[in-house]
From Swiss-Prot:
It is found in: Cell membrane. It comes from Synechocystis sp. (strain ATCC 27184 / PCC 6803 / Kazusa). GO terms for biological process: potassium ion transmembrane transport; regulation of intracellular pH; sodium ion import across plasma membrane. One of its GO terms (molecular function) is sodium:proton antiporter activity. The chain crosses the membrane at residues 29-49, 71-91, 117-137, 138-158, 207-227, 256-276, 296-316, 323-343, 358-378, 389-409. This is Na(+)/H(+) antiporter NhaS2. Disruption phenotype: Mutant cannot grow at low sodium concentrations and exhibits an increased sensitivity towards potassium. Belongs to the monovalent cation:proton antiporter 1 (CPA1) transporter (TC 2.A.36) family. The gene is nhaS2. Keywords: Antiport, Cell membrane, Ion transport, Membrane, Sodium, Sodium transport, Transmembrane, Transmembrane helix, Transport. PANTHER family: NA(+)_H(+) ANTIPORTER NHAS2, SODIUM/HYDROGEN EXCHANGER. Required for Na(+) uptake into the cell, especially at low external Na(+) concentrations or low Na(+)/K(+) ratios. May be part of a sodium cycle that permits re-entry of sodium into the cell. The keyword Ribosomal protein does not apply. Its main location: membrane.
Amino acid sequence: MIKLPVLLADINIQSLPTEPELILNNLAITTLVENLIILLLVATLVALVARWLKIPYVIGLVLAGLAIPRGLSVGLNPELILNFFLPILIFEAAINTDISRLRSTIKPITVLAGPGVVISAAITAVLLKIGLGLAWVTAAGVSVILTITDTVSVIAAFRSVPVPRRLATIVEGESMLNDGVAMVLLSVITTIHIQGGFSAGEGIRQIFVAFVGGGLVGLGLGYLCVGLFRQLNDDLSDILLTVSVSLGTFQIGQMLGVSSAIAVVVAGLVIGNLALKQTSASIKVTLLSFWEYAGFGVNTLIFLLVGIEVYPSILLSTIPAALIAIVAYQIGRVFSIYPLLYLLSFFDRPLPLRWQHVLIAGNVKGSLSMALALALPLTLPGRDQVVTLVFSTVMVSLIGQGLSLPWVVKKLQLSKPSPLAQKIAMLQLNLVTAKAAQGELKYLLEAGSLPKFLYEELFADYQARIANSEQELREFYNQRNLIFSEGEVEKKYIDGLYRRLYIAEKSAINDALAKGILADDISDEYLQVLNEKLLALQDD
């Protein structure tokens, strides 16, 4: 049995704020602003490097954070994490979830996010108790925290390698719901720690009240928000309203003693599927863009700051414990995926075995796990060790599992492109390469490095390739109904082209408005049409 080393003397716990006297109170406001500016610039640079290296953005943030001097830290306040960051992450996932897509996958999602989380957490807790010698209540808390899946990393892998839409929906839906389930279980474990235990009946009652009460609070506030949406009909006011609802729902849930996470999830689903459908297309685009940015910003700060807060030497010393934790929660995941989905196949459409492999390989940990670790009560035995263990486990998971996930998904060949998709891709490749070659020919001609007769001959050859490719693509476009019936890959190709064109049109209109070239009334009408077309592409 490997004992988790006592890190209290090694890691500067002041860097993981556990007292009211936080780093934020010790830094001058000007220094804090300067640090934030530097961190934002670092995050921007990381995004560019991650795109160039073709690695997930969040992994780049963590690695960059490890290299950043600790003097740039702005502190990680547990109260800020719990009451501000968590509601934003949960609400952003919920407001972007289409209930109509969830209906067809509700059974596997419910099984995985309900009994699946309980089984996985129980097995993980036993293995952590045996492998790391943690106290039972501590092992239970860590196991629940590590049942949460990082949707950001998984969806990033799905974008690089196309997967069936139903699988993506299951992953997103399970991740959204198991956040709430994990927080309820963590609340029960915390209560057991504080009270010294209670009966099984009392535990079931608490869980029931947390789920049902949270759902009712979310429904009530969500429907109230729907009514206010009808009255406001203004994008900026609607943004303020949704921010108030997301943060306020979380606080009300805590005050009433119900699941704040479930309340925020339900409120987000109601607003995203009822309120937004009653607003104009431009308001909907603005709102969804705002929440996409909010979620992106929170994830950026959490991953970057966590990388700063953990000493590389401490991370290296806790890698053995982190590897044990990863093995433990992966074993728990195996026993919650294969048996449950096998039993479910008798009552619902079976999930292919390759999909189940992805659900296990995609069991990557992320920002929510770290946020919950920071929000643990200060009196929990070994809390400082737990925080360090969770941080190290998340980092190893992101780097190891996060980098390997796209390769695993590609090897499983979940969505083979049809011959038609391959043909379209080849024609597009011909267009790109031929036009690039023509551009180089023009440059050589103007520089005097190429005779004109040779330029004309070579240019004509490439022009013939372009003409042939464009003719074949035009024929595919004229048969677009056939293309759509071939599968989602081809439709995504056409939709992607339209989306880029519509965005280019919007950009041109906004530039013209800024220069006073176009009238506001006519431009607003056309922008509304473009927004509706963009939303139609998203809804397909």
